[in-house]
Amino acid sequence: MKVLVVGDIVGRPGRNTLQVFLEKYKDNYDFVIVNGENSAAGFGITIKIADEFLSWGVDVISGGNHSWDKKEIYEYMDNSDRILRPANYPEGVCGKGYTILEDKKGNKIALISLQGRVFMSAVDCPFRTARRLIDEISKTTKNIIVDFHAEATSEKIALGKYSDGDISLFYGTHTHVQTADERILNNGTGYISDVGMTGSQNGVIGTNLETIINKFLTSLPQKFEVAEGDEQLCGIEVEIDEKTGKCQKIKRINWSENEGFRS
């Protein structure tokens, strides 16, 4: 089973880059995951954008702390099994924290969305939530993937190793900076601390450069706007043995329309 994971899509530049990439390469993959919580001008996701992603070949959209920025998506999240928000939010919050779908070949595959607690808003324990959901989902499929939307690399490493051998793939999102620590852990789980961002490289993690510089210089509130130009797609491609649920290969992707795949 070959899985594509695309990092946090930031605004229209990120969406356009994703569309071009999928038009060229989506047939190479059995299952496609994107993180869409920054896809609507950097804050949240709309119904129109979610539908566009799915029409382009995305199988499931994961979320994070910006999942609720657009209120129109609330009911959509309740009714769809193809868009997720972090599972460790309080009981009664709209949406779903995990889903079990099928890849192109009919293999069952699950995605769990979780959010970290270090340097972020208080939520339920991601470790205990992960353990509960993994134990539940493993009764249905061994092919389990976790998107951990978190700030601290240490928290990501800890939860990745805590889950090692019980899931197929653990990857981080949120920082918008792709890390170079992809590997297969001791018990067969693919791991990377952060898959990176899909959007403009001209700003600061997807936001207009001048705005961010002014924020640092003055400490005054700024209106954040999405950066444009020199777009890139960051993510990973992963091969999973669908019979055992073990990761066989994990590879970073860094791609632009003008330059193609970068090493």
Task: Tell where the protein language model's regions lie, with residue ranges.
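Acidic, metal/ion-coordinating pockets
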Residues: 1-263
